[in-house]
Amino acid sequence: MTSLRRKARIAALQTLYEIDCTEHKAEDAVIHSTTEQSLSQEAISFTEKLVQGVLKNKSKIDEVIGRFAPSFPVAQMSVIDRNILRVAIFEILMDNTPVKVAINEAIELAKIFGSDSSPRLINGVLGSIVTKYGKASHKRPKEGKWQPSLKN
């Protein structure tokens, strides 16, 4: 059985994919993806939180991706991989999701929706971010304490 939060993450990924590939408004894309999956109100709220959080912080998140995946420019990365990373990085940096959960969920989404190499890419990028900033304790950094610099 798929958890409520996994279903919400799937809907968020589908929403972000739709927004990335079309000119659709975020609100319309959220309605489309959550209606398709018949999500509960709690799952819809979590989906909206993820989508809004990623969109609000997209440029900062994309800078982090670029820093830790220099061989894979964000614009050239597959739409699925790019948005899986965006959701996971949002959850790690700006949400209450434990680091281990965010990474595991991202890898599972990569296995379901990505290519054969997606889980390895996702794990490598997220693992590098966590290792660089010493957050391997699998706990979210305290508010305002973890603002990754894009410098070495």
What spans do the regions from the language model cover?
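N-terminal interaction/assembly modules
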Residues: 1-119, 123-152
